[in-house]
Amino acid sequence: MAPKVGINGFGRIGRIVFRNAIEAGTVDVVAVNDPFIETHYAAYMLKYDSQHGQFKGTIETYDEGLIVNGKKIRFHTERDPANIPWGQDGAEYIVESTGVFTTQEKASAHLKGGAKKVVISAPSADAPMFVMGVNNETYKKDIQVLSNASCTTNCLAPLAKVINDNFGIIEGLMTTVHSYTATQKVVDGPSAKDWRGGRTAATNIIPSSTGAAKAVGKVIPSLNGKLTGMAMRVPTSNVSVVDLTVRTEKAVTYDQIKDAVKKASENELKGILGYTEDDIVSTDLNGDTRSSIFDAKAGIALNSNFIKLVSWYDNEWGYSRRVVDLITYISKVDAQ
């Protein structure tokens, strides 16, 4: 039986997790909570999406929530996660996608309402992080609060794993060329902690920080301290790309790297890591469900130990599909 899921926070990721849950069919969303959205407005936001198009199905409202494809889904407007009656709705696995409750202590408030597990759809300072295809098999059923890491870590980690497993990584630097997100500004505005981040998203390339590369060391312990990186926020609305430059332990040709990535993409990382030799651009991957799509033509080797690798990701859709996959996976472990 599909695990019953509740979603807290019906913003970009919350809504796209919802769409992916329906598309994948492996989890059953039974309830949603968002204190800032009324039910009829939630229906509108779910139906129409500027990036991913109209919802393919039917959406109606009733006095207690939404009716999606004929199925009732309770909608709550609680500000405090502890007050959301997940237990009454039968929701066991909660997607914490507000971006606010990202620590174990804050996210565990959901357990008070009857939930069994909480998956944070963001990096966490203290909750264990899992990346599907990389370290999900280290999950133990006594873990109650966990993180699906970030979209960028989900792109970088599978690629880094393949390179490290086959050729060894001495050290590496990553740049993610990242589409703008909701935290950025439409026009110049105040941003006290990040002055550059307060500048207009649609007309600037904005250097920014990211913890995504360092986080790889948490999901692949042998790479701890060997990777770091930064971001360039660019004027595109979705789909980002990781540029990973690594020094390898073993001498390697670029063709050998391509072969290793292609093999992994067709076997143990199928559906998570992709491989393409097509001349693609970012919009070609809008709506792609994979975490990381290796661009064989875009990378380059300086010598046999120093290589630049390029991998794309739909930072909304692909990441949200992994949230669904992680819940599907841990529910099977929990049932054993």
Curated annotation (Swiss-Prot):
Gene3D superfamilies associated with the record: Dihydrodipicolinate Reductase, domain 2 (3.30.360.10), NAD(P)-binding Rossmann-like Domain (3.40.50.720)
Positions of the catalytic residues: C151
Keyword NAD: yes
A Gene Ontology term for the protein's cellular component: cytosol
Enzyme class: oxidoreductase
Catalytic activity: D-glyceraldehyde 3-phosphate + phosphate + NAD(+) = (2R)-3-phospho-glyceroyl phosphate + NADH + H(+)
Cited PROSITE patterns: GAPDH (PS00071)
Pathway assigned to this chain's UniProt record: Carbohydrate degradation; glycolysis; pyruvate from D-glyceraldehyde 3-phosphate: step 1/5
GO molecular function, a single term: NADP binding
Site (Activates thiol group during catalysis): H178
Induction of the gene: Up-regulated when grown with elevated levels of potassium chloride.
GO terms, biological process: cellular response to osmotic stress; gluconeogenesis; glycolytic process
Pfam families assigned: Gp_dh_C, Gp_dh_N
Entry-linked InterPro entries: GlycerAld/Erythrose_P_DH (IPR020831), GlycerAld_3-P_DH_AS (IPR020830), GlycerAld_3-P_DH_cat (IPR020829), GlycerAld_3-P_DH_NAD(P)-bd (IPR020828), Glyceraldehyde-3-P_DH_1 (IPR006424), NAD(P)-bd_dom_sf (IPR036291)
Family statement: Belongs to the glyceraldehyde-3-phosphate dehydrogenase family.
Reported function: Involved in osmoadaptation.
Protein name: Glyceraldehyde-3-phosphate dehydrogenase
Natural source organism: Emericella nidulans (strain FGSC A4 / ATCC 38163 / CBS 112.46 / NRRL 194 / M139) (Aspergillus nidulans)
